[in-house]
Each structure stands twice: as structure tokens, then as C-alpha cells.
């Protein structure tokens, strides 16, 4: 009985801590089939570890030992924080979605680097003292045409 109560409280806390989902620009972007077959899709990074088994490995081979010295900066983004950054960006339909410190989210065009939109859940500053390891997070999750974000 005690275990069931603790489990119910934990699930409730998780649900309460989640913010409303944010819409992706293109409906139907992520589904079970895409997540399970992510290893065969080298154009996107749909989840935290890229593949369903969380290997965090990119199969792209356009950059190699012979041409790496000729690379130049295509674009960069200022994440507007001096705090830690631990989130893995998602790449879906040519857009990069990244969460930063304080659970803020930004969407960029992957080719141009243009900021498409940003979201600030307005996490109270006093929350920082409650976090064990700074105000970082592990990123957003995508399902269907929405992004999901857990906040402090």
C-alpha cells in the first residue's frame, strides 16, 4: 500500500512539473515508427540519444579526417546563459530544438541558424537553490506535432 502511494505521488509530481506542450511547426513530426526506426534516418535527431537504444552516435560521414581541417563556421547561436548546458538538441524537419538553463526552449532553422521562436516558462529564480546540480535539464521530447518540457 505504501509503495502504491509513493508511486502515485511521484507520478503526480511529474505531471504537475510538466509545462504544456509547445507546437512544432509541422504536424505529425514524430511517432512510434519514426522513433523505432531512427537508426535508419540520418537526417534527424528525434530523441535524447538519437536512436531507440540511446546510442548517441551519428552515422553521418561527410566530415572525416581528410576534410575536417577545411571546415568553417556556418552559424552559431548565443544561448543567453552563463549557466550549465547539458541538453541534447533535437533535429526534426530541418529545425533544431534546444532547451537551455532555466528550462527555456529555442527553435532554429538548421541551415541558416535563424531563430524561429523561443519559450521561457519563467522558472522562479529561487528554484535554483533547490536543484542539486544547477538549473540545467536534459532537453525536450517530441511526440506527434508537439514538444514536451519538464521544468524545475
What are these regions (language model features)?
Residues 22-79, 114-129:
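Aromatic (tryptophan-biased) beta-strands that constitute blades/sheets of beta-rich domains
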Residues 11-13:
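Repetitive helical segments and hydrophobic/amphipathic motifs
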Residues 1-6:
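Bacterial N-terminal signal peptides that target proteins for export
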Residues 15-17:
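C-terminal motif of bacterial Sec signal peptides marking the signal peptidase cleavage site
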Residues 45-49, 84-104, 129-152:
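Repeat-blade elements of multi-bladed beta-propeller folds
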